[in-house]
């Protein structure tokens, strides 16, 4: 393996695209909490003073969409003097939702490979390809660049919410570049944080002085706490640390950029370290394999790495609309596997049920929003859907399945 630098980014919950993801998933949570059979494809658009809900929803649930949208925007932090042209109390909220197409509904409700097995009776909600990935670079079996980028973004939001740095505003981005030697991460090359802030900080109005103060504050209150338990830590001498490289970041959020659901799919997954099938997650109910099958693919890949059958594993699944069973399953271990990829593929087929209804049942995806107090999917809409130690995600719990793979693989070793 060659030496290289790999870079991944994350964004905070106040980023315009992430506002949209959270609103779409808050709608999904609310609908599933009241009607677990809801069919949801909810898209959100935000701009200065405007939030638009659109898409297709079929549900028995009755929902005050406008009230819910304002609640999410307020909780993110867009309210009052720091709203910046996008106040939760005064922004316009437009709702333009249709029902799910009966042609799609028919294929999902009654798969073409239907039989007495109930899990065969639910077809995939669309065609498509999904990837799952895991590697042994971090305890959560995620690539280090995206893992660290999320840590920084989470800590950045935390010090804002807790008013440790009360000049911070909701919009922000992080980016991390990691040095690899022979394919193994060895040091943090660069950390970049762009964070929205007030025009004046502690009486300081000079642009360069403000930037320098933010840089010093972020190193102490964001970078060091976010990395204190890592084996690979940033160094004042060796790690390049960039903050707001344009000089200032006062105008942000939807006032600075329009936002749209599903535009941060690489942030949501593996930071570009693994392939992506192109389908977004947020606002989609579990019958949409863009979401549920991507979770299942991660579950498979993580189980393989946890079982130490490979140091890296990437799993591709493909589906046809209205068909229950995957069209194809592919596994790649990049030369790190201890058994052949053909044998690994057979292990997957024999130990994982990857039909949509089986995935939904395995992870209890329809019922989790209600069980979690009305909020489950929204929590995944910021800071990644995978490797989340702060959330109890069923596709991340692989102890039992990895042990099963260890036993099943013994005859192949």
UniProtKB/Swiss-Prot annotation:
User: Where does the record place it?
Assistant: Cytoplasm
What does the record note about the cofactor?
Binds 2 divalent ions per subunit.
Protein name, per record:
S-adenosylmethionine synthase
Any single Pfam family the record assigns to this protein: S-AdoMet_synt_M
Q: Where is this region: Flexible loop?
A: 100-110
Q: In which pathway does it act?
A: Amino-acid biosynthesis; S-adenosyl-L-methionine biosynthesis; S-adenosyl-L-methionine from L-methionine: step 1/1
Q: Which residues bind ATP?
A: 15, 171-173, 248-249, 257, 263-264, 280, 284
Q: Which residues bind K(+)?
A: 43
**Sorted alphabetically, which keywords does the UniProt record give?**
ATP-binding, Cytoplasm, Magnesium, Metal-binding, Nucleotide-binding, One-carbon metabolism, Potassium, Transferase
Q: Which CDD domains match?
A: S-AdoMet_synt
Give the species.
Answer: Prochlorococcus marinus subsp. pastoris (strain CCMP1986 / NIES-2087 / MED4)
Which reactions appear under catalytic activity for this entry? L-methionine + ATP + H2O = S-adenosyl-L-methionine + phosphate + diphosphate
According to its UniProt record, this protein's enzyme class is transferase
Q: Which PROSITE patterns match?
A: ADOMET_SYNTHASE_1, ADOMET_SYNTHASE_2
The record's family statement is:
Belongs to the AdoMet synthase family.
| InterPro entries according to UniProt | ADOMET_SYNTHASE_CS, S-AdoMet_synt_C, S-AdoMet_synt_central, S-AdoMet_synt_N, S-AdoMet_synthetase, S-AdoMet_synthetase_sfam
Which positions in this protein are listed as binding L-methionine? 56, 100, 257, 288
Q: What is its EC number?
A: 2.5.1.6
């Amino acid at each position: 393996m060659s030496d290289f630098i790999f870079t991944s980014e994350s964004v905070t919950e106040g980023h315009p695209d992430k506002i949209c993801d959270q609103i779409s998933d808050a709608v999904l949570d609310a609908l599933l909490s009241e009607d677990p059979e809801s069919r949801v494809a909810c898209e959100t658009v935000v701009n200065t003073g405007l939030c638009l809900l659109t898409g297709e929803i079929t549900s028995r649930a009755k929902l005050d969409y406008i009230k819910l949208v304002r609640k999410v925007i307020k909780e993110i932090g867009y309210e009052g003097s720091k709203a910046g042209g996008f106040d939760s109390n005064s922004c316009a909220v437009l709702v333009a939702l249709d029902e799910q197409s009966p042609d799609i509904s028919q294929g999902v409700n009654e798969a073409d490979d239907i039989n007495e097995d109930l899990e065969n009776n639910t077809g995939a909600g669309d065609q498509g390809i999904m990837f799952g990935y895991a590697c042994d670079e971090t305890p959560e079996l995620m690539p280090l660049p995206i893992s660290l980028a999320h840590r920084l973004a989470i800590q950045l939001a935390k010090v804002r919410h807790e008013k440790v740095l009360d000049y911070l505003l909701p919009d922000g981005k992080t980016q991390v570049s990691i040095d690899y030697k022979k394919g193994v991460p060895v040091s943090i090359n660069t950390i970049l944080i762009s964070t929205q802030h007030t025009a004046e900080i502690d009486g300081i109005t000079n642009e360069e002085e403000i930037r320098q103060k933010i840089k010093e504050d972020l190193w102490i209150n964001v970078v060091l706490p976010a990395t204190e338990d890592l084996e690979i830590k940033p160094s004042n001498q060796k790690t390049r640390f960039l903050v707001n490289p344009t000089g200032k970041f006062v105008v942000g959020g939807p006032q600075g950029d329009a936002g749209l659901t599903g535009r941060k799919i690489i942030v949501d997954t593996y930071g570009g370290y693994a392939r992506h099938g192109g389908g977004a997650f947020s606002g989609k109910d579990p019958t949409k394999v863009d979401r549920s099958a991507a979770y299942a693919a991660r579950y498979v890949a993580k189980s393989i790495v946890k079982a130490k059958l490979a140091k890296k594993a990437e799993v591709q699944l493909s589906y046809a609309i209205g068909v229950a069973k995957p069209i194809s399953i592919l596994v790649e271990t990049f030369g790190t596997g201890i058994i052949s990829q053909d044998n690994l593929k057979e292990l997957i087929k024999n130990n994982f049920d990857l039909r949509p209804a089986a995935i939904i049942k395995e992870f209890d995806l329809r019922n989790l929003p209600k069980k979690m107090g009305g909020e489950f999917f929204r929590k995944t809409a910021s800071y990644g859907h995978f490797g989340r130690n702060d959330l109890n995600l069923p596709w991340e719990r692989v102890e039992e399945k990895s042990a099963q793979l260890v036993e099943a693989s013994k005859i192949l070793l």
